[in-house]
Amino acid sequence: MPEGKLEAPSRTLVLPDLLRCLVLTWSEGRADLLRSAARNESWQATVNIDVREFLRNVFLLRVPLTFVDLPSVQQHDYSIWQNAAERTKDLSDSLVVVCGFGGDPLEELWARQLGAWAYLPGDNGLAGLELIFGDARKAVANKALVCVELDGYR
């Protein structure tokens, strides 16, 4: 390459085999399902059932994806779970996925106003969860690619 010419950065991005994500869910059964879906799409999930532990991990861990699995609106501590999602947006720059319990339109509106990257209107089973984890992996890769390209031109 002739001297004085800058080479544009490569558009090839190599991601680690397992990306890390943080998950908050309300039951052991859901935790197992979410862990499986994440693993099947190359995510290494740190799954929390306790909201305080989750918020501590949001603060301590820098992960590109955070998944908040909300309980039923009728559950007495539902607002605590919503608050956890809001704090996640305040404390991190990760993509936030909100999974609702039963497709409540007000819940979806709240998630959209929060700035959630994606909202799932209820239990989509393993295949639906794998789809969202796969899409998130692509979004994180694209975000990283943009950062790599911008850094290459400095």
Report the location of each language-model feature.
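Acidic, metal-coordinating helix/loop segments flanking the phosphotransfer/catalytic sites
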Residues: I49-L65, V73
